[in-house]
């Protein structure tokens, strides 16, 4: 642990010397960027099926089967109606069982959340550099606050933009513009970090923000990668190194790998 902290301190000092004066803030997506939200959703789905299966030995216990209901787009990604549809289509619905499944869903999502390695330390180092940190998420304010509180990061961010605040979801530019307006910053003064090329990288880049693609959290890779982001993060800790390269005249972006290389 001491060795890791010493390495982080060394990186921070190097970044402090090279950080571009124009970079003033880092705007983070939340789910699958700070923590693996899909993993806890699947755990919650598994526990729901386990509960329902106690009275039906023939029920398939594949959590992906229930998870697919959340992906349909019929309701929101966290809407209980997805659980209700699943239960009704399998003739498992009762009001009592439904309430219990919703409680299981909320409980398991939160209690199993774990930050990706290095998130807490990296955020602390970014703040030491004087960078302002904010969240831009498609979750609503209630769920965003609950998750950030659970992992102990609620106070790490100066501002949070949620779907119920803007009335839209990414890739609508309103999320990014709302954050910039709240922070009083220009697009070129901010960096966006997110796991979705379509919803985070592409719209942010079109607005003129710098972009860092959190590939480690992208559970639905897309072919839409060409020129859609400035740098690829294979781990969250890679962010410190990228910020350190932004001011270097000897570093350029590899158009194929989107990683920084010396010419």
Regions found by a protein language model. Name each.
Residues 1-26, 39, 120, 124-263:
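Asp-based, Mg2+/Mn2+-dependent phosphohydrolase catalytic module
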Residues 4-125, 142:
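N-terminal helical cap/lid subdomain that shapes the substrate entry/recognition surface
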């Amino acid at each position: 642990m001491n060795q890791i902290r010493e390495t982080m301190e060394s990186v921070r000092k190097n970044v402090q010397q090279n950080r571009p004066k124009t970079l003033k803030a880092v705007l983070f997506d939340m789910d699958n960027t700070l923590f693996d939200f899909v993993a806890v959703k699947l755990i919650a789905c598994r526990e729901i099926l386990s509960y329902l299966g106690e009275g039906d030995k023939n029920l398939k216990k594949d959590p992906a089967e229930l998870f697919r209901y959340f992906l349909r787009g019929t309701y929101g990604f966290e809407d209980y109606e997805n659980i209700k549809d699943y239960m009704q289509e399998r003739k498992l619905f009762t009001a009592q069982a439904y309430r219990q499944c919703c409680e299981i869903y909320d409980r398991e999502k939160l209690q199993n959340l774990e930050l990706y390695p290095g998130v807490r330390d990296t955020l602390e180092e970014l703040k030491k550099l004087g960078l302002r940190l904010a969240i831009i998420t498609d979750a609503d304010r209630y769920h965003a606050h609950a998750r950030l509180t659970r992992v102990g990061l609620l106070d790490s961010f100066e501002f949070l933009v949620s779907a119920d605040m803007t009335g839209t979801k990414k890739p609508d530019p309103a999320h990014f513009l709302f954050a910039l307006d709240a922070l009083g910053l220009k697009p070129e003064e901010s960096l966006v970090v997110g796991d979705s090329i379509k919803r985070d990288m592409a719209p942010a880049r079109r607005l003129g923000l710098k972009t860092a693609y959190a590939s480690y959290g992208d559970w639905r890779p897309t072919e839409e990668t060409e020129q859609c982001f400035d740098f690829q993060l294979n781990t969250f800790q890679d962010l410190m190194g990228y910020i350190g390269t932004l001011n270097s005249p000897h570093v350029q972006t590899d158009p194929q790998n989107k990683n920084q290389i010396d010419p």
